[in-house]
Amino acid sequence: METELLKVFDSNRIQTGVASREEVHRLGHWHEVFHCWFASSEAGVDYLYLQHRCAMKKDYPNLWDITPAGHLLAHETVYDGVREIKEELGIDVSFDELVPLGIIEYHQTKEGFIDKELANVFLYESAHSFDDFTLQPEEVSGLVKVVLTDFEELWTEAKDKVYIKGFEMNHEGRRMMN
């Protein structure tokens, strides 16, 4: 597999160079990522989509995550982030369809892994059905939607469970609806 090269930044968001993804996370360099929250509104109810990260992922395996998210490579700009949508979900979206929400600084340290992200965050108002999605199995093992207000209550710990609707891919590549 080819080494992914990422732009690295200082604490003022000024690019200072380029480094491998491994070095970026080992040394804790600030780097750019693309996050796109899929949302929909159905019968007056707002939903937020989440993807289930593949259990084989090196970073944050088997967790629910933003739909989709990924590193911006050294030769890419934020406009190229839409490739993550196509790669992970099989949906063609143009950058003009995205609503910019800002750049969020995110920092997490685990043993041997320092993740310092400058997350370029966007919203996509989706009219797609679950049948429209083709998941990239190396990255994503499932896709669900949750009522937005329920998700907010889960996030703020007002609830400890929420109802989700969507699917997981089984080991044979078939969709298992929930």
Task: Identify the role of each PLM range.
Residues 23-35, 44-88:
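Conserved Nudix-box catalytic region and its N-terminal flanking loop in Nudix hydrolases
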Residues 1-44:
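Acidic, metal-coordinating catalytic segment for phosphate/diphosphate chemistry
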Residues 102-178:
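Nudix hydrolase/Nudix homology domain
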Residues 92-102:
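A short coil-to-beta-strand element that immediately follows conserved catalytic motifs
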Residues 15-18, 50, 177:
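A sequence-level detector of short linear motifs
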